[in-house]
Structures are given as structure tokens and as C-alpha cells.
UniProtKB/Swiss-Prot annotation:
Keyword terms, alphabetized: Cytoplasm, Methyltransferase, rRNA processing, S-adenosyl-L-methionine, Transferase
A GO molecular-function descriptor: rRNA (cytosine-2'-O-)-methyltransferase activity
Localization, UniProt: Cytoplasm
Lineage: Bacteria, Pseudomonadati, Aquificota, Aquificia, Aquificales
Main localization of the protein described in the UniProt heading: cytoplasm
Gene Ontology cellular-component annotations: cytoplasm
Pfam families hit by this protein: TP_methylase
Catalytic reaction(s) noted: cytidine(1402) in 16S rRNA + S-adenosyl-L-methionine = 2'-O-methylcytidine(1402) in 16S rRNA + S-adenosyl-L-homocysteine + H(+)
Function: Catalyzes the 2'-O-methylation of the ribose of cytidine 1402 (C1402) in 16S rRNA.
NCBIfam families linked: 16S rRNA (cytidine(1402)-2'-O)-methyltransferase (TIGR00096)
EC number, UniProt record: 2.1.1.198
Protein name as annotated: Ribosomal RNA small subunit methyltransferase I
Record family assignment: Belongs to the methyltransferase superfamily. RsmI family.
Length: 230
């Protein structure tokens, strides 16, 4: 049998493919980071009778052996993330890698991905981009100096609302003219983009008493945002 890699909505529960729903209905086992999150989706689509396997860092090694054993026993297993496409900034890649090494078929479904949604909605260059995952908590200055030394169209990273202002202020000292797009609460009721020069975006955030929601940060040194149309 095989491992199915199934993307799930990043906010709006309607953002799931018919094929993904059919896979979740057909398998007996679903590997997930947080069983509570996937249960909300399963309940929404009336999918019942599934065995949920907690698959999260740092317990993934134990579960990998269990999941591979299930597949060897002719069971299909679906891998899901808390939101979006599995293996993007989550431990899913380790399971996929292990299955490939064991010659177990891996079938990846296309679907929601916060970084791509944010990049497209940012209006910043898409011809080349670098995904940085979650913003680092240590050695930030040296990290960003190294990152911005590369010749890349856009840079994308995930950041928390509590740290976004500090991160932008640090980056502004390294690249004072960089263009920024903050994508907040993507696909949800309060979805918002804040776009502009990094200094202007910082000033906008300072006006707000409380920044909430999941954030994707897109940056570009090409300064193409809102230039006059040809």
C-alpha cells in the first residue's frame, strides 16, 4: 500500500480538494500533528471511524516505525499537517523520506500552502524566491545578513504576531529600503495584506494596539511594489 500526503485548509475549511476528501474517507489511518485540528476538518465533512496517529516533533521517530509497519501490512496511511501542505515547516518530510528509503509508494496531492498564497498575494517577484521557514530566535542579525546577501527575487518566512515588529525593525537596519508584504490570517474572515516599504509598514504596525493572527512575511530587495504600470 502507500502513504498519501494530503494538504488541508490553511484557514477556510472549503479550501480542500474533492480528491483530498476522498482519500481521507478511504484510509483507515491518518497521521497528524494535532488530533484536535484534524478532527474539526473530519467532522465538517462527516468523515468518521478513522484512527488518528499523533505524529509530531520530537516523537516522530517512534511513529515512523509504526506507520511503516502499518503500510507493510497493506494499510494506506494519510499524512496531514495542522494546516496546509505536510512537510513544509513540519516533521512530515522525515516520514516521507523514510518511506522512500523503504521503497514505499508516496502519493502527494496538490493543495493549500500558506507561503505560496502569501507570495502570490504580495505582489512581489515570483520568478525566484527563498523560503526561510520560521524566523530564528537566536543569531538573527547574522542570519538575515547571510540571507539577504543572496540574489533572490523574494524571501518568505513565518513569524508570530508577538515578534513581527521586532523582526521588521532588525531587518530594516540591514536592508533599509527593502519592500515588505505582511499576509495575515490568510483565507480567514479577517485576512489582510500590509504592503509597502519596510519603514512604512513598521509605522503602520506601531499604530496598532494588538497584532493577532498567523503571519507570513514576504520581502524583496527589487522594490517593484506599486511602481507605475507600463
Amino acid at each position: 500500500m502507500k502513504l498519501y500526503v494530503v494538504p488541508t485548509p490553511i484557514g477556510n475549511l472549503e479550501d480542500i480538494t474533492i480528491r483530498a476528501i476522498n482519500i481521507l474517507k478511504s484510509v483507515k489511518f491518518i497521521a497528524c500533528e494535532d488530533t484536535r485540528r484534524i478532527q474539526i476538518l473530519l467532522k465538517h465533512y462527516n468523515i468518521e471511524g478513522k484512527t488518528l496517529l499523533s505524529y509530531y516533533h520530537p516523537k516522530e521517530a517512534i511513529q515512523i516505525r509504526k506507520i511503516i509497519s502499518l503500510i507493510r501490512k497493506d494499510e494506506d496511511v494519510a499524512l496531514v499537517s495542522d494546516a496546509g501542505t505536510p512537510s513544509i515547516s513540519d516533521p512530515g518530510f522525515k516520514l516521507i523520506n523514510a518511506c522512500i528509503k523503504e521503497d514505499i509508494p508516496v502519493e502527494v496531492l496538490p493543495g493549500p500552502c500558506a507561503l505560496i498564497t502569501a507570495l502570490v498575494g504580495s505582489g512581489l517577484p515570483t520568478h525566484s524566491f527563498m523560503f526561510l521557514g520560521f524566523a530564528p530566535r537566536k543569531s538573527q542579525e547574522s542570519f538575515y545578513k547571510e540571507v539577504f546577501s543572496s540574489d533572490t527575487g523574494s524571501y518568505i518566512l513565518y513569524e508570530s504576531p508577538q515578534r513581527i515588529l521586532d523582526t521588521l525593525e532588525l531587518i530594516s537596519h540591514i536592508e533599509p529600503n527593502i519592500t515588505v508584504a505582511i499576509a495575515r490570517e490568510l483565507t480567514k474572515m479577517h485576512e489582510e495584506y500590509i504592503r509597502g516599504n519596510i519603514k512604512d509598514v513598521i509605522e503602520e504596525l506601531k499604530k496598532r494596539n494588538n497584532i493577532k493572527g498567523e503571519i507570513v512575511l514576504v520581502l524583496s530587495k527589487e522594490n517593484t511594489l506599486y511602481q507605475e504600470s507600463l
